[in-house]
């Protein structure tokens, strides 16, 4: 990567094909908004894709802070702009076509996303800095439930990873300075109560 105008903010290595996804930001020096994009490199280091705009030419991202790939190939990113208060989960299909924005549950406060991952059911799990919980949404952007609502030792969930073999959710806590594991799916791929 040799472009000096764009700064890499996050990286993700796809277990599907070994591609490297990089979340990028161009910080505007004027009063205009920051711009973001996701670029994809194949296993030989060749740039193969840039995802930046929706089908109307509107920018999809401002600051791509966290990125993951769902089982169906969708690219899932936490996007935010703390200057303006904008924050959302942005999902595109593998080819780059915009699918949806998720900004929080219908009856709750707006999401302030941080860490993000997906599980064996293709659910999207995202840390919410506003509620200090991990939100679970469907692969189509519908809110399912909150996980880990202020459990002991987890003061501010900040980063996530899902272990697909052991079905464990790894959660890093910013304020608690801990990394913890949680099981919410049993080994038979059912939800635990």
Enumerate the predicted regions with their spans.
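Eukaryotic scaffold repeat domains enriched in small/polar residues
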Residues: 1-193
């Amino acid at each position: 990567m040799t472009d000096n105008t764009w700064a890499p903010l996050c990286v993700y290595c796809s277990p599907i094909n070994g591609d490297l996804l990089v979340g990028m930001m161009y910080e505007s020096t004027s009063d205009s908004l920051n711009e973001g994009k996701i670029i994809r490199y194949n296993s030989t280091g060749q740039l193969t894709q840039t995802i930046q705009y929706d089908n109307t030419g509107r920018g999809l991202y401002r600051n791509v802070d966290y990125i993951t790939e769902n089982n169906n190939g969708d690219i899932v990113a936490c996007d935010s702009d703390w200057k303006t208060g904008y924050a959302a989960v942005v999902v595109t299909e593998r080819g780059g076509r915009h699918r949806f924005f998720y900004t929080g549950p219908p009856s709750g406060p707006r999401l302030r996303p941080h860490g993000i991952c997906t599980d064996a059911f293709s659910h999207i799990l995202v840390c919410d800095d506003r509620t200090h919980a991990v939100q679970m949404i469907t692969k189509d952007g519908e809110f399912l439930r909150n996980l880990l609502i202020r459990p002991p030792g987890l003061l501010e969930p900040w980063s996530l990873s899902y272990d697909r073999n052991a079905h464990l959710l790894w959660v890093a806590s910013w304020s608690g300075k801990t990394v913890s594991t949680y099981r919410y799916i049993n080994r038979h791929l059912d939800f635990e109560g």
